[in-house]
Amino acid sequence: MAIVKPFKAIRPAKDKVAFVASRSYQEYSKKELEAVLSFNPFSFLHIINPGYKFDKRVSGPKRFKLVYNRYLEFLEDNIFLKDAKDSFYLYEVKKDNFQCCGLFCATSVEDYQSNIIKKHEDTIRPREELFAHYLETVKFNAEPVLMTYKDDKTISKIIANERRNEPEYHFTTTDKVTHRLWVISETETVNQLETAFIKLKALYIADGHHRSASSNLLAQISKKNNPDHTGNEPYNRFMSYLIPESEIKIYEFNRMVKDLNGLTKKEFLIKLDGSFRIENKGNTLYKPTKKHHFSMYLDGEFYSLYLRKKVYRFTDALSKLDTQILFKTVLGPILNVQDLRNDKRIQYGYGKHNIIRMKDEVDQGNFAVGFSLVPITMNQIKAIANAGLTMPPKSTYIEPKLRSGLTIYEL
């Protein structure tokens, strides 16, 4: 039973929405960020970079307070407006050959605690605490947690009907992504959606594990500090974007390692031979085509690595993941990369055209070896989450990557 609720969103004025909604802060280069802040006074980036107003970089709790001040200024200047009715927000993204359509809504902290909302990544406690403090100070969610659910005919039919209507927003951003958003506030449709989601057994976090964990921590702190707690306070929920699992796009993260851990090329290949059947593919770009099959780039040549299944033990859903197999057979025992999150000798690059970058980095001598994997599937993610396990860091790069400031949930 997934509890999904409508909410009164704070959202951009219709004539400014294309200027307000921003990509994730980390996606901007320093040059891009400076350009947006200099020439676009409506960008949400002004809220999350509040020191720009004074030409001063601000961090920590001081920044949190200034973020809240900038948010209030956007409200005072009518850049942001508040909806009068609780609503769901249907949002469609189109780019190249990718398209998805889902719902902005308020999801339940109680569902997170009871594992109806399922996780597949570890979170870092200090980051949870820092972001919980941030949420407590700024009093809003602007970046939704991306979740997915098993395709459902009832939900799909409701969404299809709503998409026939004229959207509230329809705009294209400079990265050539087309955005459309519909406000669903009609009581009957809202109730139908709530009822349909209640019938779902689970929601799966695709992206935003720290955001959801921090919202859970904030709810615990707020409940403890509120003697009149009822369970209906806004802090008992957090903003999410829900899409059917058939519409999510998963890319791989390739791995590049700085050195061969003191081994020569021949010694390294001999050690690999214990776990893989190795074939030299020459200098033509070569990508793996199925699970348990890897592409390796070393010393100007590509190699295919086929796992020797008779020497590797499959014990659970985690052991079947290619990212885990590579860690257990190569990265850990041969290359001595034991901490996938913090070891400076390893770097990651997400799919699409990244195998070209991987080759270039090795050719330039920045890394000794690179490994390309096939993308993990949604079924594998669900198997990990259902078993209460967590995947190695950088196992998936997931689209859509959502814009900030399109809908805001006040806490």
Task: Show which residues each predicted segment covers.
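Surface-exposed, charge/polar-rich loops and edge strands
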Residues: 1-411
